[in-house]
């Protein structure tokens, strides 16, 4: 047996029995840990995008609706039926309101208030230019007639100083449609998703009665932009100092679409000793209430393992492809509900001196369905999402090792619940603007099954629980973490100081041999984002609670410095 086969055999046996006690000195764990670290970065990036999403509000002139006191001494009429004339099917929800006022005696002032109730219902549903009128009529037959005049879109045009940016893939409405302000808000949100353009909208009266013109004002900047940054978020085993370069291209097909390319890697210059490399491509395109995104990412990690009698290079590479569809199915002035469906494939391979270890190869496919809700409570924002993810045997996924699963081994055909909750509340601290942010993330595997390390939840780094250097983390099949932050702006320095307090826990079969299952930590930091393009973030953190035997620094400091262009 040659030395390569000895190494492969020992690593294969070790990989079957290793617990998810992630420690950088173990020969196999750092690669799995590096893959999890990259996923944690992606999760944090998605969380930041959710929290920073701009609220889209439109201001439209609404008719003044003043209820009139009921005239008890005036003439009254018995209303058997309310008849809505001229009402299109899009406004048929008004029919549900008629029963409330039928089979009653009403006065003239009551009739005005009934009309106001129908008008308020239209406004509540977003039909701000549709009107309800009381025509002349004889009420002796007990039928109250109300005339419904739908407000329609006469035209969609640009203002004189506006850039002629594309709107057809973003706006749901077209000329001739009944105008709903919620549909316009959805379109503006899709157009504002493109970072290089800002959009405002006005409703102007049309030439015909009951029609409106949507006037768009678009300002566009350079469609190519990006950033370069350096941080110390990596691992000792594969390179602490990491560099990244990201560039985005807007309006690739003039459809309010964006293509983004990212490259990252270690800056250690250690050659074959250790290192990381990663690249990703992402494309997103809207279509009215739908948003489609496609992503491809590839990463590779390696380290030199000092072993007796032979040193060897242990490496891993991972490829992930994901497609996602998001659909907004309900929208009000203060709430937005959506569902999303995604499918992703992931191929993981491990090598010793460029020879693959077959027992550690992993090819999986998963699907996910989620429902989300974004609610505005005053000036606060509450986002919540509940998702269900399950492994399937399609698109090149490897067969399930049923015998291994029966003996307690990991499964790729899992069923997992996912939950995310984000809350942000701006307030004033003394005389300075401030904010409180709280974010929860959790996953629960049904049936208590064990999953592969790439599907576990990982806590103990700057992206999950502050206070820990990430060299030793806790992984579990199920688990959660809660991140809390209070931040205050220093206006004259254009910076923000923040205090973080995090806690997390892991559970499941993979966590049974851990030194503990819960940790907590805190951090204080400062960050800035300047008009010149310079950005930075620096913090110092410490554990508040860790199990006995959990090895980490008493104080851990982290930084990110970069430049936007």
What positions do the PLM features span?
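Extracellular loop and loop/strand-boundary signature of outer-membrane beta-barrel proteins
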Residues: 176, 231-233, 266-269, 307-312, ...
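Periplasmic polypeptide-binding modules associated with outer-membrane biogenesis and secretion
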Residues: 25-234, 263-277, 439-442
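Repeated loop/turn-to-beta-strand initiation elements of outer-membrane beta-barrel proteins
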Residues: 199, 224-226, 253-259, 288-294, ...
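Transmembrane beta-strands of outer-membrane beta-barrel pores
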Residues: 230-234, 251, 263-269, 287, ...
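Outer-membrane beta-barrel "beta-signal"
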Residues: 247, 323, 526-528, 553-565
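C-terminal outer-membrane beta-barrel translocator/porin domains of Gram-negative envelope proteins
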Residues: 351-495, 500-503, 507-508
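Transmembrane beta-strand segments that form the barrel wall of outer-membrane beta-barrel proteins
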Residues: 224-234, 245, 256-269, 279-281, ...
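Residues that define the transmembrane beta-barrel architecture of outer-membrane proteins
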Residues: 210-212, 239-243, 275-279, 317-321, ...
